[in-house]
């Protein structure tokens, strides 16, 4: 089974998250996408972060597609960093083929994530285009560091079964929605 892992604060979850998930399901030929609602992002301000249980409930109410599952399990395992969460999942589910999913806006700061290189060694990564990042994301520090591991967009359906490191950038229709913009309204 091929599972896309889409982590984030989901503060709040919105139609843009659904767009990214459906794009990944279709273009990567995934069976499921799991939304990993994080207890807190070490790189973001927690002052505006709604409680985890509220964000999980709101995300579940939005994600009515049966191929999308919402979980807040990171809080239960005491994980604070994506690399730790992904390592935990890979150890417990070795028969599953995971792909880490991220928006192109996150690729610009990916090199600041704790052990970002370990994430790329644990599973392939799919970067989904976002407005304003089409041209800048591929020149991000992490993208440059792993340029030789980038696969062609036409080969994206095979990403989940490729040896790591491997990543791709998926162009296409983009959603301009963002949780930050929704919170400031």
UniProtKB/Swiss-Prot annotation:
It holds the Pfam family CTP_transf_like. It catalyses: nicotinate beta-D-ribonucleotide + ATP + H(+) = deamido-NAD(+) + diphosphate. Its EC number is 2.7.7.18. Keywords: ATP-binding, NAD, Nucleotide-binding, Nucleotidyltransferase, Pyridine nucleotide biosynthesis, Transferase. It comes from Methylorubrum extorquens (strain PA1). This is Probable nicotinate-nucleotide adenylyltransferase. Belongs to the NadD family. The gene is nadD. It comes from the Bacteria. Catalyzes the reversible adenylation of nicotinate mononucleotide (NaMN) to nicotinic acid adenine dinucleotide (NaAD). Pathway: Cofactor biosynthesis; NAD(+) biosynthesis; deamido-NAD(+) from nicotinate D-ribonucleotide: step 1/1.
